[in-house]
Amino acid sequence: MSGPIVIFDSGIGGLSIFDEIKKVLPDQGYCYLFDNARLPYGELEESVLIKGCVDLICEQVKRIDAVLVVVACNSASTLVLPGLRARLSIPIVGVVPAIKPAAQISKTRHIGLLATHGTIKRSYTRELIKEFAGDCKVDLFGSSELVMLAEAKLAGEKLDLIKLESQLKPIQHSDLDTLVLGCTHFPIIADEIQQVLGAGVKLLDSGKAIAQRVSYLLENIEDKLDNSAGELMAIYTTEEITPGLATRLAEKGFTTIASRSSANLD
């Protein structure tokens, strides 16, 4: 029998993907695995990121007999999917920046991508733009500071609007009409981003599309639920997390919240 879905990210950004998946699969079991010891991923060397992510995810999949993996991190998805698929026989779902739908809905043919520096510089991102937004002007905006602002918000801290406005200033000076949130952390602060940029800029992310893909894949997996169905566990890679973050995870229904080093999940 198979166990829960593993949703993986460097930090709490993947919770935006978890929320969308849980809406369509409310009774499924989930393991939210976040590598906060190495946050933010957008600043890591590619070789370090690949090996660390693949080893960590494979270890957790085998430990809990997971049925499917969602790599809920744009920076990681651009690099680690081949390595995971080579080692695991279960479905692996990555997150792709919503370039295609942004190009489809833009009225001015001018869109933007807001992501980590790692995602911005990858050739995979350029190929997406070339394939799906070749007739658009595409502005690229890199920020790791926004990742940390989202982390702080979900941990219960007050969002630093001055820092947020500073990070978004280049976008304010652009005349784009559609902005892709190309990091799963960014939907967590989407309301604040919208407030700064104004109603004239449409924000897009990949959450709903990922949820639909996961639902489709699970329909083709027999015995996808077992006695652990509905159980929610959150595993992190630091020794501890802040009380504020632990509270937020509990509010989302996670009953097991533990460090990877101390979690006894066998």
UniProtKB/Swiss-Prot annotation:
Under catalytic activity, the entry for this protein gives: L-glutamate = D-glutamate
UniProt-recorded Gene Ontology molecular function terms: glutamate racemase activity
Can you tell me which residues form the catalytic site? Answer: 73 (proton donor/acceptor), 183 (proton donor/acceptor)
Q: What is the superkingdom listed in this entry's lineage?
A: Bacteria
The UniProt entry, under InterPro entries, shows: Asp/Glu/hydantoin_racemase, Asp/Glu_race, Asp/Glu_racemase_AS_1, Asp/Glu_racemase_AS_2, Glu_race
Q: Which NCBIfam families match?
A: glut_race
Provide the protein name.
Glutamate racemase
Q: Name its species.
A: Shewanella halifaxensis (strain HAW-EB4)
Query: Top-down, what is the taxonomic lineage of the species of origin?
Result: Bacteria, Pseudomonadati, Pseudomonadota, Gammaproteobacteria, Alteromonadales
Q: Which gene encodes it?
A: murI
